Amino acid sequence: MNLIVANGLEKKFQNKQVVHGLDLEIKQGEILALIGPNGVGKSTTIAMLLGIIQPDKGSVSYWRNDYKKHIGAQLQTTPFFEGYSARENLKLFGALYQVKLSDEEINHKLACYHLSDTGRTPAVKLSLGQQKRLAIGVTTVHEPELIILDEPTAGLDPRASHEIKKMILNMSENQRTVLFSSHNMDEVEEIADRVIFMNHGQIVAAGKPEDLTKKHQVKNLELLYLKLTETVK
């Protein structure tokens, strides 16, 4: 089953075509990676899928009428209250999503996010990796069916990135669907079931990582990235 189907999405900003003729599907249960250079329309595409901005042309259809209640989205802005602790943030976001969390449930979530030792520390004082994990935690506190993460490992060291990857894989094991964007091709190759590659506002390649590398006769996604973004002189 498809959770989201987008057809012919177009978006301009100040006469610049940011997204052009974009078609995509998000399939239930998959980990889908959206990749491509900076400025090719990935974040704009995500915003259109979420209904944050409206496309100039095209349509987006959803698997249920109340889809907004069943999506958790962590974008590139800080989604939590910086002056409150991780524990307090989980309780606050639970209330926003009308989910009443017991102390036991909050303790369990903090353990899952590896934040048990810092659960009472103000979020602003957490490390970047801890803040990223908390950001995912508060945006998924209502156990959404679809989770959208915009560059969740950006700026993180390998250990912190590894923790985020484990969280994403755990979501998939718990029957969640995940769409994430990334510039780390090793990361994408490691955890993504399917990849959508964007360039110049369009999808230029899509499929399973192993199928794409085989089709384009390259050893890995990093080499495919270089091939598809090569500038012809």
Question: Model-predicted segments: where are they?
Answer:
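Catalytic Walker B motif of ABC-type/P-loop ATPase nucleotide-binding domains
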Residues: 147-151
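Conserved ABC ATPase "signature" region
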Residues: 91, 95, 101-118
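A short, surface-exposed alpha-helical micro-motif characterized by mixed small hydrophobic
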Residues: 188-190
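Conserved ABC ATPase signature
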Residues: 122-126
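ABC ATPase "signature
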Residues: 206-207
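Conserved ABC transporter NBD signature motif
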Residues: 58-69
